[in-house]
Amino acid sequence: MSDKKALSLSDLDATKASAEAFEFEYLIDGEPSGIFFSVLGGQSEVVTREVAELINAKRRRDVARAVRAKSGKPADFDPIEEDIEFGQRLAAVRLVGWRGISDPFTPENALKLCQTNRDIAAKITEESDNIANFMKL
């Protein structure tokens, strides 16, 4: 039998743990860059709320499109650029700070960074989705 103490539901609250920023250094070819990002966890309320808002907006467009199609109006579609922007916005909302970048951190600059550097955006999302970065059991 293990000597580990039992965990409470509070100990397993990933939403609460994900609300505390996690800082990581961005590596370039495995080497330190001196650039550090602070991210919220993917299960945080802030990230979850933004994801819901983005998905709900897409669903509203889909419903409006279906209604137009039934009325005989020309159908349109969501271009791939909207899907790319969706992913960039999902990465940017997770980012709450940085060190080693001369520009000030703002939500607008976070989005700009995620729009102009896919590798950084992907790393932000990866670290944010890694629950081990936030849960300390």
Label each PLM-derived region with a short phrase.
Residues 1-63, 134-137:
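Short, charged/polar N-terminal "headpieces" of proteins
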Residues 97-137:
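C-terminal charged interaction modules
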Residues 13-16, 94, 102-105:
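Solvent-exposed, flexible loop/coil residues
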Residues 12, 47-55, 86-87, 91, ...:
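Generic structural signal of hydrophobic/aromatic residues within well-ordered alpha-helices
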Residues 33, 44-45, 75, 100-103:
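Polar low-complexity intrinsically disordered regions enriched in Ser/Thr and small residues
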Residues 51-96:
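Negatively charged, Asp/Glu-rich surface segments that serve as flexible interaction/assembly modules
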